[in-house]
Amino acid sequence: MTVLIHVLGSDIPHHNRTVLRFFNDALAATSEHAREFMVVGKDDGLSDSCPALSVQFFPGKKSLAEAVIAKAKANRQQRFFFHGQFNPTLWLALLSGGIKPSQFYWHIWGADLYELSSGLRYKLFYPLRRLAQKRVGCVFATRGDLSFFAKTHPKVRGELLYFPTRMDASLNTMANDRQREGKMTILVGNSGDRSNEHIAALRAVHQQFGDTVKVVVPMGYPPHNEAYIEEVRQAGLELFSEENLQVLSEKLEFDAYLTLLRQCDLGYFIFARQQGIGTLCLLIQAGIPCVLNRENPFWQDMTEQHLPVLFTTDDLNEDIVREAQRQLASVDKNTIAFFSPNYLQGWQRALAIAAGEVA
C-alpha cells in the first residue's frame, strides 16, 4: 500500500509546527501513514525536533503544488491529506483532474472554508474553489464546520476531527481552585490577525460593560504587524482608560500565554467563522467562558459537549458571566471531545480513512 502524504501547503509557521510536533509525538510511532510530509516554509530546526517524520520543505506554495501534482499524476494510488488548504493551485488541480477526488483528503482549518475576503481576486476565485470542494474525497472538520460545509456540498463525506491543540490534561481541574471577584478581565481576540476584528470587538465590549472592565488584546502574532497594532491601541484608548487596556505586541511563549489566559474572566471573539480553537480550548480548560458570534458554528461543538455559550448579541453583565463560570466549573473537562488526549481517537480514524485502510 502507498504511504499517505501529508501536505501543509502554506507558510503558516505556528500551525505547521503544532501539526508536525503532534504527528511526531503522538502518531508516527503507531502508523506509517503519519510520517511523510510536504511543507511550505523553512526548516528552522523542525527536522531535528521531529525525528520520527520525513519532511520535505518547499520555498513557496507554487513549488509545493507542482510537486504534489506531479506525484498525484505519477501514481493515482497516492493519497494526500491536506491540513488546511489555502493553496489555490491545488484547488485548481483538483478541479481540472490533475489530482483525483480519491487522492484528496482535507482537514478544514476554518479560513480555508469561509468566503469572507472582499477583494476582487478572492471574489473571482471563490466560485472555482467551491466547485473544486465538491470533488474532495473526504473532509474532516469540527461539528459546526461539517454542518456549514454540508449545506453546499451535501454529497461529500464528512468526518469529525479537531485541530491538535497543545494542551496539558493535568490542568483540566486548575480552574476549580480559582476565586473570581472584583473587576473583570476580558480577552479580546486570539491573535493579532485582522480577522479578529479587534476594533469592532473593543467597541462591542465597551457597549456591554463600559470602562468598568480590563481588556487584554494579544497581538504578538503574526510578526511585522506594528501599524495595525498601533491602530488597535489608539482605537482602544478612545474607549477605555489606559489602566483598563493592555495591548500585547510581543509574542508570548506557551507558558506565559497560559498564565495570561488564567488571569481572564471572559473571552470575547467577534469573528463570524470558526477560528482560534486553540485559544478557546485553553480558556475553557481554565474555566473561562467565551462569547462567540452566532455565525461562528463552533458553538455547535460547545453545546454538544454541554458547555455554556454566550453570544455577542446577548445582553451581558457580570452576573451572567459569573453564572457561565459556575456552569463551566461543573463540567468534567476530561470528557470534552476537542480536548487532548480525546481528539487522538479522531486522528487515528482520519488517518485510516485517508489511507484507504477503512471504508
UniProtKB/Swiss-Prot annotation:
Membrane topology according to the record: Peripheral membrane protein
Keyword Cell membrane: yes
A matching Pfam family: Glyco_transf_56
Reaction(s) catalysed (UniProt annotation): beta-D-ManNAcA-(1->4)-alpha-D-GlcNAc-di-trans,octa-cis-undecaprenyl diphosphate + dTDP-4-acetamido-4,6-dideoxy-alpha-D-galactose = alpha-D-FucNAc4-(1->4)-beta-D-ManNAcA-(1->4)-D-GlcNAc-undecaprenyl diphosphate + dTDP + H(+)
Subcellular localization, as worded in the UniProt entry: Cell inner membrane
Stated family: Belongs to the glycosyltransferase 56 family.
This protein's name: TDP-N-acetylfucosamine:lipid II N-acetylfucosaminyltransferase
Organism: Escherichia coli O157:H7 (strain EC4115 / EHEC)
